[in-house]
Regions:
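Exposed, low-structure sequence patches enriched in small/polar residues
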Residues: 1-284
């Protein structure tokens, strides 16, 4: 079962010189119930690899439920979380006196502050526990966009930050052995991940000469990203996985585009494009 509820609103305030401010509020509620039951047919006498039953046949439901439940790897969970999100949005627009001429600027900023509360009831074999966590997150975003020289030149700069937090089951001491060759552990020390993104777009055009140039570049970096590390046991062939926070994940790249006519009659046009991107991934 999965339920969600959202409610919120904004109120716009208009000021002189094309300035607008909009304070806002949003409430989110989430409720999730999950039951995972693992049954081991090989635990029944006569139903294993050396059994006499043909492939595809199943035992009765009573036998199945009473004797084959893998309590160690079966669980029930009930997750409830809610968030209060207050935000302040502001924008300013510097319009030219004549449409399509002069200089035009647009600036906007969104400053949201969010409080998140989560609680998880979890049952697994002999484990019966409740875990609660609280998060305060600030996820700002900014944009500066300008055009000048009769709108034939311009630049667009953007930045935003996002925060993500680990699953609540990560903060419960769990050892999952449902796949005997790939054992999975939790990590109660995981931190929230923070991602920063910035991009720049610039163009330089000449409508009279039909020459067009533009370039776009972006950079993204993640702090405390979650990676799955593992230890391999050569004697048994078993891998034991455990999530960890890592730093150093980023990517940077962009493209450059240019076009121009090759002859005076402008029957032939040269189009060129160059793009590149570098990914740096840190693992365990």
């Amino acid at each position: 079962r999965d339920l969600n509820l959202n409610a919120g609103g904004e109120y716009w305030l208009w000021f002189p010189h094309n300035l607008a401010v909009a304070p806002g509020y949003n409430y989110h509620w989430h409720d999730n119930t999950k039951r995972y039951e693992l049954y081991r047919l090989d635990e029944l006498a006569g139903w294993g690899e050396d059994g006499d039953h043909p492939l595809g046949m199943l035992p009765s439901e009573v036998e199945l439920l009473q004797q084959t439940l893998d309590a160690l790897n079966s669980y029930w969970s009930y997750l409830t979380d809610y968030s209060h999100r207050g935000s302040l949005y502001a924008k300013w627009e510097g319009k030219p006196r004549t449409s399509g001429e002069g200089t035009w600027w647009y600036v906007e900023a969104r400053l949201p502050l969010m409080y998140v509360w989560q609680t998880l009831d979890y049952q697994r074999e002999r484990l019966d526990t409740t875990v609660s966590r609280r998060h305060v997150m600030f996820e700002p975003s900014f944009r500066v966009y300008g055009r000048w020289h009769n709108f034939q030149r311009g630049i667009d700069i953007r930045y935003n930050k996002s925060v993500s937090f680990p699953s609540m089951t990560s903060f419960i001491d769990i050892r999952s052995t449902d796949d005997p060759l790939n054992i999975r552990l939790s990590n109660t020390g995981l931190k929230n991940s923070h991602q920063h993104n910035i991009s720049v777009y610039y163009y330089l055009n000449s409508n009279r000469k039909q020459r067009y140039f533009n370039t776009y570049w972006s950079y993204s970096i993640t702090q405390d990203a979650v990676a799955q590390g593992y230890v391999y046991d050569k004697a048994t062939g078993v891998r034991t996985y455990r999530p960890e926070n890592v730093n150093g994940n980023y990517n940077i790249g962009g493209n450059v585009n240019y076009s121009m006519p090759l002859d005076k009659a402008r029957r032939l046009t040269l189009n060129s494009a160059l793009w590149s991107r570098l990914y740096n991934s840190v693992d365990l």
